[in-house]
Amino acid sequence: MIARLVGFLVEKNSDSAVIDVNGVGYLVQLSGRALDYFSEIEGEITVHIETQIREDSITLFGFASYLERDWFRLLTSVQGVGGKAALAILTALTCDAISVAISSGDKTMICRANGIGPKIAQRIINELKEKPAAIALFSSAKGDHLAVEDISQPAASAHHAGNFMADAVSALLNLGFKPAEAQRVVQLASEELGDQATLDSLVRLALRLSSKH
């Protein structure tokens, strides 16, 4: 079972990429967010992998963080939600937004994902809302009934800024940064971006700042 790939992104499509690891190219299915994230990195990348084995195929699904991978596992545990549907949800919504949608029972939010209708969205909510593994991922987002547009906008409160910073530090740690360095450059990025900070912008600016020191 492949759990992680460390290599170079050498080819990308709308929903997948080829990762070159020591001369061997692995075709990996990715969410739009993960694909955008990896495309911004020059050099070696670390892709967390979930391997799905079927009778006639082996498919590698890749993620930029453990959190994204864990949500993929939870989503695909729901009856009728396959790997592509789970990636569609992870493309349309951040992990924080998925937490809010499920904990608040907002199926309209989940329906923003391509191919996800009200029936499947409601099933996701019903099956995951009280599931211990899902509750553990809700964190402080549980009970926060923010509107859909609030999730897609830059962080407007210390609560969400803190979540973005923690996720950004985690992303840098996955890329091989030492904890102190990851904390330092994310803090610098947060101070520079202010209220306009999002997870993507924090990680990208932190990577640029780290290359200057």
Swiss-Prot record:
SUPFAM superfamilies: DNA helicase RuvA subunit, C-terminal domain (SSF46929), Nucleic acid-binding proteins (SSF50249), RuvA domain 2-like (SSF47781). Residues 144-159 are annotated as: Flexible linker. Its main location: cytoplasm. One of its GO terms (molecular function) is ATP binding. It is found in: Cytoplasm. CDD domains: UBA_RuvA_C (cd14332). Residues 160-213 are annotated as: Domain III. Residues 65-143 are annotated as: Domain II. One of its GO terms (biological process) is DNA repair. GO terms for cellular component: cytoplasm; Holliday junction helicase complex; Holliday junction resolvase complex. Gene3D superfamilies: 5' to 3' exonuclease, C-terminal subdomain, DNA helicase RuvA subunit, C-terminal domain, Nucleic acid-binding proteins. Keywords: Cytoplasm, DNA damage, DNA recombination, DNA repair, DNA-binding. SMART domains: HhH1. Residues 1-64 are annotated as: Domain I. Has three domains with a flexible linker between the domains II and III and assumes an 'L' shape. Domain III is highly mobile and contacts RuvB. HAMAP family: DNA_HJ_migration_RuvA. Homotetramer. Forms an RuvA(8)-RuvB(12)-Holliday junction (HJ) complex. HJ DNA is sandwiched between 2 RuvA tetramers; dsDNA enters through RuvA and exits via RuvB. An RuvB hexamer assembles on each DNA strand where it exits the tetramer. Each RuvB hexamer is contacted by two RuvA subunits (via domain III) on 2 adjacent RuvB subunits; this complex drives branch migration. In the full resolvosome a probable DNA-RuvA(4)-RuvB(12)-RuvC(2) complex forms which resolves the HJ. Belongs to the RuvA family. The RuvA-RuvB-RuvC complex processes Holliday junction (HJ) DNA during genetic recombination and DNA repair, while the RuvA-RuvB complex plays an important role in the rescue of blocked DNA replication forks via replication fork reversal (RFR). RuvA specifically binds to HJ cruciform DNA, conferring on it an open structure. The RuvB hexamer acts as an ATP-dependent pump, pulling dsDNA into and through the RuvAB complex. HJ branch migration allows RuvC to scan DNA until it finds its consensus sequence, where it cleaves and resolves the cruciform DNA. This is Holliday junction branch migration complex subunit RuvA.
